[in-house]
Amino acid sequence: MGRNDTKVIHIGDRVIGGGNPILIQSMTNTKTDDVEATVAQINKLADAGCDIIRCAVPNMEAANALSSIKSKINIPLVADIHFDYKLAIAAIENGADKIRINPGNIGSTDRIKAVVDAAKDKNIPIRVGVNSGSLEKEIVEKNGGVTAEGIVESAIDKVRIIEDLGYDNLVVSIKSSDVLMCVKAHELVSKEINYPLHVGITESGTIISGNIKSSIGLGLILNQGIGDTIRVSLTGDPLEEIKSAKLILRTLGLREGGIEVVSCPTCGRTQIDLISLANQVENMVADIPLNIKVAVMGCVVNGPGEAKEADIGIAGGINEGLIIKKGEIIKKVPEDKLISELRNELLNWSE
């Protein structure tokens, strides 16, 4: 079922499903019971464009810290729970806007019911999360190994457990580090349930490998109309996850806003330190709320022509460069003034 037809779910003051905009999620890597550090990281992520934040709750200290954290942030908080149902209940009591559990590792039906009852009392959603690395032995054996079909079977089994307890305020996530398996699993599960799907490639890797795997996986899934929230899982600063997620959504035409920076790959004609210049421009435009394309080109010979599809651009030359707007050269400036002149044009932008 495509995102236009999924069930509408409220997470704090945000709404997903039913064709609502796809929201970006990340996860803190601080110790959750270190309230000051956790709040600082969440607020940085929110400023960068994070819509929903998830925090690990490995112990009761972390669960009890959630109320203090909640009072100092402005985006919904999801509590990530494994194994101990008491932590899930404590997280709910301390104000979590959603909890993430795998009913398969919470324990007996009575324990799952206790968690469901607590969520029902606060009317907060439960995210049912299944990972290819934690599939039940019998499902793996039945399918001859870890498969997309097995991931979906496990997820639906967990959903039915909670539905049978009288609750359907649910979000579902099915993840694998195998990109094509993850894509197939999402294609299959979207035909079986109407709950919103949180999409991500788990254990995708470091900045380079993680971005490539996530871009391919999320792109293939989202472009089919599947997925209601996303996370780009990276081994690194969570801020990088937000940058990547925003770019993926913008590239797919699923979100507007924010300046898109394009740059040439350099060649023997390059007459300027283009790599440094492109990075400086990307950092410089991060806080400018325009929905335009900025080109950074390496030479004044081909630069103006190649920058025609951008709204504005710069092209480097020997000790000087050009400012190009809508394909027309509007000024020539010294090399060391290119960034400041470009920023001035952006701050005074008019169509």
Regions found by a protein language model. Name each.
Residues K86-R127:
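Hydrophobic or amphipathic alpha-helical targeting/insertion segments
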Residues M1-M27, K120, N283:
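N-terminal amphipathic alpha-helix/helix-capping segment at the start of soluble metabolic enzymes
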Residues N29, D34-V35, A46-I69, R100-S108, ...:
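Glycine-rich, proline-tolerant flexible connector loops at the mouths of alpha/beta enzymes
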Residues I73-I75, E93-I99, K120-N123, S190-P196, ...:
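Glycine-enriched alpha-helix->loop->beta-strand junction motifs that scaffold or abut catalytic
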Residues N131, I139-A286:
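Catalytic alpha/beta core domains of metabolic enzymes, predominantly
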Residues M60-I81, A114-I126, H186-L197, V281-N283:
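Alpha-helix-loop-beta-strand connector modules within alpha/beta enzyme cores
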Residues I22-T28, I53-C55, L77-I81, I99-I101, ...:
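Hydrophobic faces of well-ordered beta-strands that scaffold small-molecule active sites
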Residues G19-A37, A56, I75-F83, I139-V152, ...:
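Active-site mouth loops of central-metabolism enzymes
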